[in-house]
A protein has these predicted regions:
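H-loop (His-switch) and adjacent beta-strand-loop-beta switch element
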Residues: 153, 169-170
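A generic "structured core" feature
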Residues: 151-157
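Glycine-rich NAD(P)-binding loop of Rossmann-like domains
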Residues: 116-128
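Extracellular/periplasm-exposed beta-strand and loop segments of Gram-negative cell-envelope proteins
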Residues: 108-109
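Residues immediately N-terminal to the Walker A/P-loop in ABC ATPase nucleotide-binding domains
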Residues: 145
Length: 191
């Protein structure tokens, strides 16, 4: 009981201080549950909008850069160690659930064989509809549009358009080989 009360006071203080610091760019309903280790960062002219009754578990890390916008609907839950990197726009609907370790990037580095990886970024909007379940360790890439009532299975890497009412899952193929004594030695010695 005391712990819950302290967490409510902590969240109200955290929201109030961020509203003072960022002004209109930080539009967050007062009824939230932020873990003390949840990190919300706004850079430059970035904006953050969060609806009521949203929960952020331990280790969540959300960064909004430049003129980027992060908009999260109400009654949405982010499990442990979720990450969002928004340089353009990420929109998450209401009544969504994100499993542990979900990563969302609306940006990607530019690459060429001549110059290698550049710090310049390519960006594209991401939208996630209402009533979606994004399972553990899913990676959502720039330009992804997920409709309402979708389930994205654990470990998927998604991009592109996913229509409403879709279950997305990936197939992992495991191969098994028996190791005999000769193979063990070859493996250990590198022969």
């Amino acid at each position: 009981m005391l712990r819950s009360l302290l967490l409510i006071v902590y969240n109200l203080m955290r929201i109030s201080l961020n509203k003072l610091r960022f002004g209109k760019r930080f539009a967050v309903h007062w009824m939230q549950r932020f873990s003390p280790s949840c990190d919300l960062k706004l850079f430059d002219h970035a904006q953050l909008f969060i609806g009521r009754n949203t929960e952020f578990a331990v280790g969540c890390d959300f960064e909004v850069h430049g003129d980027g916008v992060l908009h999260i609907g109400e009654n949405t839950y982010f499990n442990r160690y979720c990450m969002i990197s928004a340089h353009q726009e990420v929109r998450v609907g209401s009544h969504c659930m994100f499993g542990p370790g979900v990563r969302i990037f609306d940006n990607n580095h530019c690459f060429s064989c001549d110059r290698g990886v550049s710090s310049r970024l390519k960006t594209d909007r991401i939208t996630i509809g209402d009533h979606c379940w994004i399972a553990a360790n899913v990676i959502i890439l720039k330009g992804t549009h997920i409709g309402d009532c979708c389930v994205i299975g654990a470990g998927c890497i998604v991009s592109g358009d996913i229509p409403s009412g879709t279950l997305v899952r990936c197939r992992h193929e495991l191969t098994y080989t028996t190791i005999d004594n000769r193979d063990k030695e070859a493996f250990v010695t590198g022969d």
